[in-house]
């Protein structure tokens, strides 16, 4: 399926042009607000003690870099992955952690790269309902799920749009529940966050 190379750590999908332009016009940038996929452990997830915040390895990295730059950062829960993307696209949030680089996303966001992490995307299936998988074509004729507005790279996204029945759901738990209930044949998601 490929690696989420520029994806997860295109990690600093940042409205950098906005930041650069705003910093020059309004003075030094002193605080950033970031968000991301709240179902992405060990990288990002909602803090059970404070559900309005995200925690994880990505938050630790963002805070360390922000501290080195002398900028404050707050990493908030802005809703499911699709809403988090919309919050950045509309400028209500400054930075999006964990987006895969695609041409449509480049129209509204700048990506800082190279990525600091690659995480493999995999095809999850129900035990006892396995099927041979060697290429994208093996997914044809089956129904799959992933998160709304999730991307696995521009080439796969185009292939899926033209050849696959791939539905979007709002949460990973919903995708896996549909898989367990045999309402879908597979789930596309990254290996470590999906475990």
Where are these regions (language model features)?
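Short, hydrophobic alpha-helical packing/hinge segments within bilobed ligand-binding/sensory domains
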Residues: 61-62, 83-87, 175-178, 184, ...
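Ligand-binding cleft/hinge of the Venus flytrap
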Residues: 45-50, 62-71, 114-116, 136-140, ...
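Extracytoplasmic small-molecule ligand-binding "clamshell" domains
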Residues: 26-100, 107-108, 168-169
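A ligand-binding cleft/hinge motif common to bilobed small-molecule-binding domains
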Residues: 82, 89, 99-108, 155-158, ...
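Flexible hinge/capping segments at coil-to-helix
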Residues: 125-144
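N-terminal secretory signal peptides that target proteins for export/translocation
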Residues: 1-6
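Bacterial N-terminal signal peptides
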Residues: 9-20
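Sec/Tat signal peptide C-region and signal peptidase I cleavage site
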Residues: 21-25
């Amino acid at each position: 399926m490929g690696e989420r190379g520029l994806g997860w750590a295109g990690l600093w999908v940042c409205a950098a042009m906005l930041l650069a332009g705003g910093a020059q016009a309004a003075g030094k940038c002193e605080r950033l607000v970031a968000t991301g996929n709240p179902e992405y452990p060990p990288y990002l997830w909602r803090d059970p003690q404070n559900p309005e915040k995200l925690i994880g390895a990505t938050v630790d990295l963002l805070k360390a870099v922000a501290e080195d730059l002398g900028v404050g950062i707050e990493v908030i829960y802005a809703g499911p992955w699709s809403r988090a993307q919309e919050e950045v696209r509309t400028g209500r949030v400054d930075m999006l952690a964990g987006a895969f680089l695609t041409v449509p996303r480049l129209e509204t966001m700048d990506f800082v790269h190279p990525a600091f992490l690659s995480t493999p995307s995999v095809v999850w299936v129900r035990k006892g309902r396995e099927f041979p998988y060697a290429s994208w074509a093996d997914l044809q004729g089956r129904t799959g799920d992933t998160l709304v507005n999730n991307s696995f790279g521009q080439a796969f996204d185009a292939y899926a749009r033209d050849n696959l029945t791939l539905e979007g759901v709002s949460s990973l738990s919903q995708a896996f529940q549909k898989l367990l209930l045999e309402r879908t044949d597979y789930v596309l998601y990254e290996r470590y966050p999906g475990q």
